[in-house]
Regions:
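Feature recognizes metal-dependent phosphohydrolase scaffolds
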Residues: 1-235
């Protein structure tokens, strides 16, 4: 397993909240990547900034990942999923595969993580990194904490450990494979819980949008809150 994939899996498998300094640096670095993406695959918008449109020109498979919602295991399983090599053969020149130039030595299957490293697939997530949808009872318990004035209670920490595992894993994927990994902005990429500039404050099982905002402010402060919002704005 490569160092890049190992690092990504480490973030996705974290069972504690990330440290302030680590999170700050990761947000700063991934925002720099997003701000400087190649206009060949991410054309400029009317404001002369990287827009939200992707122009994926390479004739390779595009794997579309649906809403993630605080499921780090979902991404881990995708990276480890083995695709039959025949799936790629019609769209990939054998010489692009490096060590598999001899067609007789082609593997039967390859993991998506390995294909991503070799730039043989695109992996495109359609957004919604945080706010678990599988734990309505947990959100009810978080609501009890929240309206008691506890914004970083143990139940909310459990929710946010999973959420930050996803967020950090996504950022590491983007840093590692900027050309072939893309994460689009969904309606849940709204850490400020704003209802301006095309965003809408989010509620489903509880007041999740405000609860997450207050958690980040309480645990990490306004600097991290701003950096997350800046990362979201650059998606």
């Amino acid at each position: 397993m490569s160092k890049k994939i190992t690092s990504i899996k480490r973030y996705l498998s974290q069972k504690e909240l990330p440290l302030y300094e680590d999170l700050f640096n990761q947000l700063d670095e991934v925002s720099n990547v997003l701000e400087n993406e190649d206009v060949i695959y991410r054309p400029l918008n009317s404001n002369n900034e990287r827009g939200s449109l992707l122009d994926l020109k390479e004739d390779i498979p595009i794997i579309i990942v649906p809403d993630i919602h605080s499921r780090p295991d979902f991404i881990l399983n995708i990276l480890d999923y083995e695709l039959p090599f025949d799936f790629l053969k019609n769209k990939t020149k054998i010489c692009d595969v490096g060590e598999f130039e001899n067609q007789k030595n082609l593997p039967q299957k390859m993991k998506i993580g390995n294909l991503l490293e070799k730039e043989l697939v695109y992996l495109v997530c359609v957004g919604d990194a945080i706010h678990s949808e599988l734990t309505p009872k947990r959100w009810a318990s978080i609501e009890d904490e929240f309206y008691s004035g506890i914004y970083d209670g143990p139940v909310m920490q459990e929710e946010m450990i999973a959420g930050f595992a996803v967020l950090c894993g996504i950022m590491e994927l983007k840093r590692a494979f900027p050309k072939n990994f893309h994460f689009l902005k969904g309606n849940h990429e709204n850490i400020l819980n704003s209802s301006e500039n095309g965003d809408y404050a989010f509620k489903k099982y509880a007041d999740e949008g405000e609860m997450v905002k207050k958690f980040v402010q309480t645990v990490y402060g306004d600097d991290i809150l701003y950096l997350i919002s800046y990362f979201e704005a650059n998606l």
